[in-house]
């Protein structure tokens, strides 16, 4: 049985899974391959303790090992929904993003355990409507992406569409991280402007 996600602010102790060139948003899913020993240990610990972990992007993607200062300060509380064995001890994971979380303190050791603060999304205000309208315009020109996002959506939360767009649109990992760190209103504003800019570029305007 899955433990419910805590409501409101609060702190948790979670194993930390560093991400390379990837970012995970709440209400979105992410598939990735884990093959480094510390990361495999994180998966093992998470599987024994509620299948929850903090998925957080590395600042330097080429770093072989990621310490506290090598990680961005904001990541996502995630649940492991699937673990599949691969060759040479690697694992393929499926993660579901639950809530944004701020990295407060990392406890040392080969496997990092972090104290994290769960973050509130806040009020998206009028920017949410503008972002959804921009997403509708973009998806009107990309029926395949619209079908994909329909399949991926697993929440009726107002920010679900915006977070799915942040997760799956063709932008860089750095841009995704900036969106993850932004407040709900700022994220809506940025993704709305970005979607319209992408559409204009594709049309050659």
Regions from the PLM with identified roles:
Residues 1-205:
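N-terminal low-complexity, acidic/polar interaction/targeting segments
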């Amino acid at each position: 049985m899955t433990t419910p996600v805590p409501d409101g602010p609060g702190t948790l102790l979670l194993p930390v899974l560093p991400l390379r060139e990837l970012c995970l948003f709440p209400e979105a899913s992410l598939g990735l391959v884990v093959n480094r020993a510390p990361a495999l240990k994180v998966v093992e610990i998470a599987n024994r303790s509620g299948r929850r972990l903090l998925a957080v992007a590395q600042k330097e993607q080429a770093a072989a090992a990621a310490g506290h200062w090598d990680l961005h300060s904001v990541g996502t509380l995630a649940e492991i929904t699937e673990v599949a064995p691969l060759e040479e001890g690697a694992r393929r994971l499926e993660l579901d993003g639950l809530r944004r979380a701020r990295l407060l303190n990392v406890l040392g050791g080969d496997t990092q355990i972090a104290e994290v603060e769960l973050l509130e999304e806040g009020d998206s205000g009028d920017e949410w409507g503008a972002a959804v309208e921009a997403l509708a315009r973009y998806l009107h020109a990309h029926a395949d992406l619209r079908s994909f996002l329909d399949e991926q959506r697993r929440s009726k939360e107002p920010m679900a569409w915006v977070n799915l767009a942040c997760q799956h649109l063709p932008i860089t990992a750095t841009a995704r991280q900036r969106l993850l760190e932004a407040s709900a209103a700022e994220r809506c504003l940025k993704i709305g402007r970005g979607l319209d800019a992408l559409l204009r570029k594709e049309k050659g305007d």
